Every structure is written in structure tokens, then in C-alpha cells.
């Protein structure tokens, strides 16, 4: 009798936490963020290369 009450209480707590949890994990959102980081890195790398070329031209090389 006591064991069934404890088991019921644990089950009730778990179901309450499951119902009240935050938004579920979305793998596509993580994939989109990774793509944005790659895009930003490519844009940044191109800008760094352009600045390096401009500095070389300014030095007369």
C-alpha cells in the first residue's frame, strides 16, 4: 500500500514536470545557428583578406 502511494507520487511529479517543461529541443534551430556562424565566418574571412590586400597595396607591394 505504501509502495503504491510512493510510486503514484513519483509518477505524478514526473508527469507534472513533463507538462510544465520549456519548449522542446529543436535540432533545426541549432542547425540554423551553425549555418549562421559559418556564414558570418566566411563574410569575416573575406573582409580580413581584403584588408590584408589593401594594406599590401598601400605599402607598395
Curated annotation (Swiss-Prot):
Major site of localization recorded for this protein: secreted
Propeptide stretch(es), residue numbers: 23-24
Pfam families, A to Z: Cecropin
Protein family according to the UniProt entry: Belongs to the cecropin family.
Residues carrying Glycine amide: 60
Keywords per UniProt: Amidation, Antibiotic, Antimicrobial, Immunity, Innate immunity, Secreted, Signal
Name of the protein described by the UniProt record: Bactericidin B-5P
A cellular component annotation (GO) from this entry: extracellular region
Function, as annotated: Cecropins have lytic and antibacterial activity against several Gram-positive and Gram-negative bacteria.
Signal peptide: 1-22
Localization per record: Secreted
Lineage per the UniProt record: Eukaryota, Metazoa, Ecdysozoa, Arthropoda, Hexapoda
GO biological process: antibacterial humoral response; defense response to Gram-positive bacterium; innate immune response
InterPro entries reported for this sequence: Cecropin (IPR000875)
